[in-house]
Amino acid sequence: MKTVIIYESKHHGNTKKVCDRVAAECRAELIEAGRVDSNFNWEDYDLIGFASGIAYSKFYDSVSRVAEQIPAGKGTFFIYTCAKNDKDFAAKIKKVVEERGAKCLGSYGCRGFNTYGPLKLIGGMNKSNPNEDELKAAVEFVKKVEETYEK
């Protein structure tokens, strides 16, 4: 099974840290969302992951724009890092890929170090995140998706 994760990671690299671990342990390919163009061959991959930090309760626009191009029938999953992991921040992007006819196989979110706005004045929040347990959980999530996916 060939898996790709299309991602954008800003600020402190929280999402990249999660994606790097998943890529290493699940043999997934990583591609920055800004590098995906009209020549991207979706057929090269069985599973498509979308990963992003969360800004204003949604995935970064660059990742969402790529998701809007996914062909019908593809299996997808979502990974995100956020300041407060209190809801499914992948809900909006899931709807986008479902409307395109892709199959949503789940999402994984964890906290990330955050110094946005006034938080920088106090040194930020979630300084130790994503932590080792969260990285392991992300890997387990993707392994489970890969094991249960049926084309």
Question: What residue spans do the PLM features occupy?
Answer:
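Conserved SAM/SAH-binding loop
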Residues: A33-D37
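FMN-binding flavodoxin-like domain, especially the glycine-rich phosphate-binding loop
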Residues: T3-I6, K10, K16-K17, A24-I31, ...
